[in-house]
Design a protein with these regions (language model features):
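ATP-dependent helicase/translocase motor core
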Residues: 1-329, 338, 342-353, 378, ...
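Short basic/glycine-enriched coil/helix segment immediately N-terminal to the Walker B
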Residues: 95, 290-294, 376-379, 395-408, ...
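Conserved RecA-like helicase motor-core motifs
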Residues: 297, 329, 344, 351-365, ...
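Inter-Walker segment of RecA-like/P-loop motor cores
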Residues: 350-395
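Conserved C-terminal RecA-like helicase domain
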Residues: 378, 509-611
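Conserved two-lobed SF2 helicase motor
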Residues: 378-392, 602-617
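SF2 helicase catalytic motif II
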Residues: 401-438
């Protein structure tokens, strides 16, 4: 087979399939190949190529609707080479001649487990600009040592089968667990898959090509042929044509973050791939609508990416309804202003145009507008609504009576908080369009009274519990680390001395934890602990959050922070330059507080956040210790 060594595209296969999928543009195959070569050189994590791959107009590279219209090839040890640098993935999968997937397979119990494989990708392959073309064209990477997931005593699995997509520096390895609601030995998708028998002639040819005919009779080889090994299961789950095309079409997102460096805002782009629970939720929503169900609850635990799921759903459902000649219009409903801001930022980071409504009149105008897109950007849009703003509004919502080809989709966030659907503005809003799709998201189970109030939404569509999220490493276990003995003794000593004053009624108990001596000793511990933790982890971006017992204690911790740090630095061989930020509802104005949170979450210019009585919900800060 003729291939292009610059991109590893199978040229003849690509041209044949291009002509087949685009009969009126058949002569453009060569020019398209040339453009793809140029795009793959871009420093954009493959965005321009992915936009071409996933689009259906003016030409198609892949037929996403009819899997059988595409051709699928695989090869082993296909070298990716540029100048003197090269790497050789174990297996490469091609769709219409395009090398879109590679798979690295290791022996069970390989040295370092899959962590070693992750380091190799993150330290050697992703940062190497010579490999940019090959990584930009690759959409899915799978790594497996053919073992069941095992954390080996840690928190995140280090053995098993993992997947990721391209990155500039490092990509997180994701677990994949096939849907298996009744815990059968083999998940239904794998058990029912129409596998074909292995052709002995093809098998012999492959073994001969790799000069390893001798392994044919070995017990290990026979075990590896088992359809249900961890590697074979993940290949069926992610690389069977229907699933792979779904992931390629809907499972990739480019996310743009900002970061302030030396007073300048810099943008960082990442490429994300759908987590498996998001994929199954999206597939289930689609099949439920097929069955005539137009509402339900998705229970995905905190931290599992519900806003990202909502983003993916906008694409999945837009396509779904366009096949029925309907145009989908999306509303994301929250119950607090800070959540409106957070959701809007998340959607915008992924490229959606966000509309918000600051008054009922404005919302009603958007609601009555029968176009899915109100702007002229051509980008998909979503309207984010803070329902709290309309809490007292109980008047009926009227819509034009005539039928339209518009399909409204409501996604209600944090449904467990009980929006009281009966008789409220939300109820009136949802009732105004009986044909709307209504999806309620919750991160915690609905309690009895909440469940009652949400009966209008029907049953759970999909669930992803916190135990799985912890196993997958998305939700962290909170590890209670005892305070070091020497500090504990000093703090106890101070506490006991002050407690005698409490008994004499000279001070209140709350004042102990606010006392200068207590606060200063606590700061000595916090600063030393974070400094040492960073050294152990070899990561100076790690930050901490202090949740105080009283607001006065928070103020004092902040007030003495620099003084205590300077005192510790006097005798330290390695000095620390930590910066603290204080967040209290009555401290500074809202813009300043937002800036402090942004400096902690994104800009990394605040190292320790001091708060009282609030863990800032949805606090998505991966740098937190």
């Amino acid at each position: 087979t003729v291939y292009d060594p610059d991109t590893n595209i199978l040229i003849n296969v690509f041209k044949e399939q291009f002509a087949r999928l685009n009969p009126t543009h058949a002569g453009e195959a060569e020019q398209t190949l040339k453009t793809i070569r140029q795009e793959l050189d871009n420093d954009d994590i493959g965005r321009s190529f992915y936009e071409r791959l996933s689009s259906v107009s003016p030409v198609r590279l892949v037929d996403f609707e009819n899997p059988k219209n595409n051709t699928y090839h695989f090869t082993a040890e296909f070298t990716c080479k540029r100048d003197q640098d090269e790497f050789r993935p174990d297996i490469t999968l091609f769709v219409n001649g395009l090398p879109l997937v590679f798979i690295e397979v290791k022996k069970p119990n390989n040295h370092g487990g899959m962590v070693a494989e992750s380091k190799r990708m993150n330290q050697k392959r992703f940062p190497n600009k010579k490999f940019r073309r090959f990584l930009n064209i690759t959409q899915l990477m799978i790594f497996s040592n053919n073992m069941e997931y095992d954390t080996m005593g840690g928190i995140v699995p280090v053995q098993g089968a993992f997947y990721c997509t391209t990155a500039k520096q490092s990509a997180p390895f994701n677990c994949f667990r096939e849907e298996n609601p009744t815990n059968l030995d083999i998940a239904p998708y794998n058990a029912d898959f129409p596998y074909k028998d292995i052709d002995p002639i093809v098998e012999k040819k492959i073994l001969t090509d790799f000069n390893c005919q001798v392994i044919h009779t070995s017990p290990e080889y026979q075990t590896n042929l088992d359809t249900y090994t961890p590697t074979n299961r993940v290949l069926t789950s992610m690389c069977s044509p229907e699933r792979l095309l779904f992931i390629l079409k809907y499972g990739i997102a480019y996310v743009r973050f900002h970061k302030e460096i030396n007073g300048k805002i810099e943008f960082i782009e990442q490429k994300h791939i759908m987590r498996y629970q998001q994929m199954f939720a999206a597939l289930t929503v689609r099949s439920k609508i097929d069955e005539g169900v137009n509402s339900g609850v998705i229970w995905h635990t905190q931290g599992s990416g519900k806003t990202a799921l909502s983003y993916y759903l906008t694409y999945v459902l837009s396509d779904y309804f366009s096949k029925q000649n309907k145009v989908a219009k999306f509303y994301f409903i929250v119950d607090r202003l800070d959540l409106l801001k957070q959701a809007s930022e998340e959607f915008e980071a992924r490229g959606l145009v966000v509309k918000t409504a600051s008054s009922r009149a404005e919302l009603m105008e958007q609601f009555r507008n029968n176009q899915a897109q109100e702007g002229n950007t051509g980008k998909p849009e979503i309207t984010v609504v803070n329902i709290q703003r309309f809490a007292e509004d109980r008047s009926k919502v009227d819509l034009p009576a005539y039928a339209t080809n518009l399909q409204r989709v409501f996604i209600i966030d944090e449904a467990h908080r009980g929006y009281k659907p009966e008789g409220s503005f939300l109820a009136n809003l949802l009732d105004a369009d009986k044909n709307a799709i209504k999806i309620a998201l919750t991160g915690t189970p609905l309690l009895k009274e909440e469940r009652e109030s949400w009966r209008v939404f029907g049953n759970y569509i999909h669930t992803y519990y916190y135990d799985k999220s912890i196993l997958d490493g998305y939700t962290l276990k909170i590890i209670r680390e005892d305070i070091e003995t020497q500090y504990k003794e000093r703090l106890s000593e101070i506490y006991e001395k002050l407690e005698t004053l409490v008994e004499k009624k000279d001070v209140k108990k709350s004042q102990i934890v606010e006392h200068d001596n207590y606060v200063k000793e606590l700061l000595r511990y916090i600063i030393s602990d974070l400094k040492r933790f960073r050294q152990i982890q070899g990561d100076n971006t790690l930050g901490g959050m202090v949740i105080c017992e009283t607001s006065e204690q928070a103020r004092k911790l902040f007030a003495y922070f620099d003084e205590i740090q300077a005192e510790l630095n006097k005798d330290a061989s390695m000095k620390s330059h930590l910066r603290a930020g204080l967040i209290l509802h009555d401290s500074d104005d809202k813009d300043t507080r937002d800036k402090i949170i942004d400096d902690f979450k994104n800009n990394m210019t605040v190292d320790i956040l001091i708060v009282f009585n609030m863990l800032l919900t949805g606090f998505d800060a991966p740098r937190l210790k």
